[in-house]
């Protein structure tokens, strides 16, 4: 009987030690997901707010220059 009680106490003690020393990663994962979501939203918002390409940047048929002029210079085209 005493041996059974000792074994139960030892098992409870070891379980408690395991729970105390275990790294709680659930909160960290939630924070990382929130951080990634925020980063993606900022990226989408920055792309949506940019309406035209600045002077000197490369341009093509699917991009719009702020000046409205995309001029070829050698092999590439640049916004004026």
Swiss-Prot record:
Function per UniProt: Omega-conotoxins act at presynaptic membranes, they bind and block voltage-gated calcium channels (Cav).
Subcellular location: Secreted
Cleaved signal peptide residues: 1-22
Pfam families per UniProt: Conotoxin
Keywords linked to the UniProt accession: Calcium channel impairing toxin, Cleavage on pair of basic residues, Disulfide bond, Ion channel impairing toxin, Knottin, Neurotoxin, Presynaptic neurotoxin, Secreted, Signal, Toxin, Voltage-gated calcium channel impairing toxin
Protein name: Omega-conotoxin-like 1
Disulfide bonds: 52-66, 59-70, 65-79
Keyword Protein transport (UniProt): no
Post-translational modification as stated in the protein's UniProt record: Peptide predicted to begin at Arg-51, but it seems more probable that it begins at Cys-52, since this position corresponds to a dibasic residue cleavage.
Family: Belongs to the conotoxin O1 superfamily.
Tissue: Expressed by the venom duct.
Main subcellular location of this protein, as a coarse class: secreted
InterPro entries the UniProt entry points to: Conotoxin (IPR004214)
């Amino acid at each position: 009987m005493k041996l059974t009680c000792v074994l139960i106490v030892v098992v409870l003690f070891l379980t408690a030690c395991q729970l105390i020393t275990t790294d709680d990663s659930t909160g960290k994962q939630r924070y990382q997901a929130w951080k990634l979501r925020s980063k993606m939203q900022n990226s989408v918002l920055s792309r949506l707010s940019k309406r035209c390409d600045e002077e000197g940047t490369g341009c093509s048929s699917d991009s719009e220059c702020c000046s409205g002029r995309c001029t070829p210079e050698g092999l590439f085209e640049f916004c004026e």
